[in-house]
Amino acid sequence: TFAHAYEASLNYSKKLNHGEAVILGMKTALSFSLSLKMLEKRDYNLILNHVNNLNLSISVNKFFTKKNLNKILFFMAKDKKNKSQKINLVLLKKIGSPQINNEYSKERLKKFFNDYLS
C-alpha cells in the first residue's frame, strides 16, 4: 500500500522506479510497525541494516516531503484492498511474522507521516 501510494503520487514517473517504491514501502511499513510498538527495535534494526547493506541508498526524503502528504494519503485511501474507511496495511510483528491490519484511518497515518517525512 505504501509503495503503490508513492508510485501513484508521482504519476508513475521515471523519477521513482517500481523497485525503489517497493524498498521505500518496506522501510515505511517497518517504521510504522515500530511506531505502533508492534515490532521490536532489535528486529527493526536487523531488517533495516540488511536493506541498507544492499547499497541502494534510497530514502523516502529523497522523493517526498510533507507537501506530498495529502497526495500519498489520497492514494493509500483509494487502494482496492481497503475496507470501509480504514486503510489496509501489511505490517510486521517480528521477523517472518507479517500481519494484515485494516484499522488505520487517514488521520492516524497523517500523524505518522508528519514525523516520518522530516
How should each PLM-predicted stretch be described?
Residues 1-67:
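Active-site segments that bind and position negatively charged phosphate/pyrophosphate groups
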Residues 38-118:
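C-terminal charged capping/lid subdomain of soluble metabolic enzymes
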